[in-house]
Amino acid sequence: MAATMMSKTIISSKQCSKPIAPPKVSINKGFVNTSAAIKNREMMVWQPFNNKMFETFSYLPPLTDEQISKQVDYILANAWTPCLEFAASDQAYAGNENCITMGPVASTYQDNRYWTMWKLPMFGCTDGSQVLTEIQACTKAFPDAYIRLVCFDANRQVQISGFLVHRPPSATDYRLPADRQV
């Protein structure tokens, strides 16, 4: 088995050492070969400026109310506890400036950022409309803040998921998917 794995590794490294040929687009009986176009798209460069992401679904355009509702239904169907959190634009991203330190000791929170909780976690919530009502109330109270919905699993005692439900209108750190690569 080790010999088989070694031979596969050698073969794949030989294939990778070949120079990259320019893409070819061929038309055969009215059909266009798009594999070259796909390969070119895969080789694009990630835009590093004003292209920040948040947790789950960050690569997608902002979610609509209907899409958020479906996610909330999924959260409730799995008996997870939804919770809303919000943060100002300058405190929303992970970084040392947002990390709470006490001398040489730093917080051990997973991504060095704390968001303020909107009310309490929604224990016992059974209806997605309750969560959507709270999202609207939080958005009305803090229109220039990032608002995310996180959910917790009481059995495993961990955060299961988190995603943005509101991005401030003044945010300039987001790019549409078509503009994320150079």
Swiss-Prot record:
Record localization: Plastid, Chloroplast
Swiss-Prot/TrEMBL keywords: Calvin cycle, Carbon dioxide fixation, Chloroplast, Photorespiration, Photosynthesis, Plastid, Transit peptide
Presequence positions on this chain: 1-41
Classification via PANTHER family: RIBULOSE BISPHOSPHATE CARBOXYLASE SMALL CHAIN 1, CHLOROPLASTIC (PTHR31262), RIBULOSE BISPHOSPHATE CARBOXYLASE SMALL SUBUNIT, CHLOROPLASTIC 1 (PTHR31262:SF0)
The organism's place on the tree of life at top rank: Eukaryota
Name by which UniProt lists this protein: Ribulose bisphosphate carboxylase small subunit, chloroplastic 6
Subunit structure: Heterohexadecamer of 8 large and 8 small subunits.
Pfam family, one: RuBisCO_small
Family: Belongs to the RuBisCO small chain family.
GO MF annotation list: ribulose-bisphosphate carboxylase activity
Main location: plastid
GO biological process: photorespiration; reductive pentose-phosphate cycle
GO cellular component: chloroplast
Extra remark beyond the main annotation: The basic functional RuBisCO is composed of a large chain homodimer in a 'head-to-tail' conformation. In form I RuBisCO this homodimer is arranged in a barrel-like tetramer with the small subunits forming a tetrameric 'cap' on each end of the 'barrel'.
